[in-house]
């Protein structure tokens, strides 16, 4: 790879990701995002090699040595407990919201969820609003209003630090856990030297939520444990 980016230009695919090396920016294929249309091989590049009849070797996984985790202290729900889940289409954001709502119903509580995906298909911004309550009748409107988010689960740093998301949060009320992994946006398919301003996005979250935000590379954790 010479870092020209023609594979991304030809394929218009966000599975072509940047890799920063001591020899400059190179390219790699994010296997979890690849849709296998192989249009990236149309790029004028000798580093793509096609193997006929080869089988994909699954990467080795590791077992995380986690300490014994205590049971969480559940908050007292006065009215509703409002959860916002953000991320990129195609990565399970809607599934997380559905699991939360279903778990609440199984536990005898009320739950309501809406998907705010708009035109987002694979790779687009997705917002899930989920309200939990002791009784279903305690939930009037499902959409979380400005400053009413109690918990933010961020699957993507860009979406989580956007003004639309931060407007739902409130200092002293909202707690957040956000994936700090660099997930490339569609801009990278058009601008080969585009870089996500990770530091600025992280600072925006920390300035808003102060010590109530936790940033971690959950994408790398998933790769290590799931392959």
Q: What are the residue ranges of the model-derived segments?
A:
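Iron-sulfur cluster-binding cysteine motifs and their immediate structural context
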Residues: 2-28, 33-58
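Active-site cofactor/cluster-binding pocket
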Residues: 49-85, 91-227
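Short conserved micro-motifs on helix faces and helix-strand junctions that flank
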Residues: 2, 86-87
